[in-house]
């Protein structure tokens, strides 16, 4: 029973590896989201004896490279809702300043305490995540398009003020 808690940030993560009763197998350390670092963590996990579960908090899109990497390697990966993690942190005995190292320890502890309730990530969620990302991009580009049209209208209104019915190019 080994819980790998990963506190994901933009471009880097903090990793802590715990066994039951708070036994720290690997002190919290930082790693980048590059292939080299992910392979190094994979090698470290392969050397460990016991069932391994990787636990991370959902962070918009930042957790996706790590999630995809370990899911494709066949690991049990669980993505936790940030609200559930916040509630757990509030009820947890780990208090004090909020740091990435403490967060990774808390996430690993969550994995140990909720071991049998953890839900394994399913691959088809990738499709929904990609659709969500594409939807966000579409909305963003539509907002840019509308702003550009509004700006063009303002420029035409200012420059063609003497013409009663301006011919618009759109």
Language-model regions, residue ranges each:
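Short glycine-rich, Thr/Ser-proximal phosphate-binding strand/loop in the N-terminal lobe
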Residues: 11-36
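Acidic, metal-coordinating catalytic cores used for nucleic-acid/nucleotide bond scission
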Residues: 55-65
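Amphipathic alpha-helical coiled-coil segments
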Residues: 131-148, 152-155
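Short, basic/hydrophobic alpha-helical segments
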Residues: 36-53
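Gly/Thr-rich phosphate-binding beta-strand-loop-beta motif of the actin/hexokinase/Hsp70
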Residues: 1-19, 107
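Short alpha-helix plus adjacent loop in nuclease-associated cores
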Residues: 78-119
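Anion (oxyanion) recognition and catalysis
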Residues: 71
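Single conserved hydrophobic/aromatic residue that forms the stacking wall/gate
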Residues: 161-170
